[in-house]
Amino acid sequence: MAKPTRGGQKKKVRRNVPSGVAHIQSTFNNTIVTIADTVGDVISWASAGSSGFKGAKKGTPFAAQQAAESAGRRAIDSGMRQCEVMVSGPGAGRETAIRALQAVGLEITLIRDVTPIPHNGCRPPKRRRV
């Protein structure tokens, strides 16, 4: 009889990565924190939704803080000590996510705002009438 195969699971490779890049994408509805090594391979990620927040609470600074702490702890477990931070988006959790990465123990060497700004590109959505 044939051996049962492992169902499509990759073996997790534990690498020792001393430095990397933390990308914080902060929108009005959610905050996503992705930590990668210098090559660009993702080491850990977390979002406000994956941290247990639902609905409008995902857009809060506290949810961004929890997501950044979760991703930062996993990055530290893989040996990361310092990182550069790339922040994009207009959301409420930008600064709190950076502070949470510092509080978790990552040394931040650079903070760069990489929010895409159009040179008069697409027409923006109409204004809300509430």
Curated annotation (Swiss-Prot):
Gene Ontology cellular component list: cytosolic small ribosomal subunit
Gene3D superfamilies per UniProt: Ribosomal protein S11
UniProt keyword terms in alphabetical order: Ribonucleoprotein, Ribosomal protein, RNA-binding, rRNA-binding
rRNA-binding in keyword set: yes
This protein's record includes keyword Electron transport: no
Function of the molecule: Located on the platform of the 30S subunit, it bridges several disparate RNA helices of the 16S rRNA. Forms part of the Shine-Dalgarno cleft in the 70S ribosome.
Name recorded for this polypeptide: Small ribosomal subunit protein uS11
Organism encoding this protein: Gloeobacter violaceus (strain ATCC 29082 / PCC 7421)
UniProt lineage: Bacteria, Bacillati, Cyanobacteriota, Cyanophyceae, Gloeobacterales
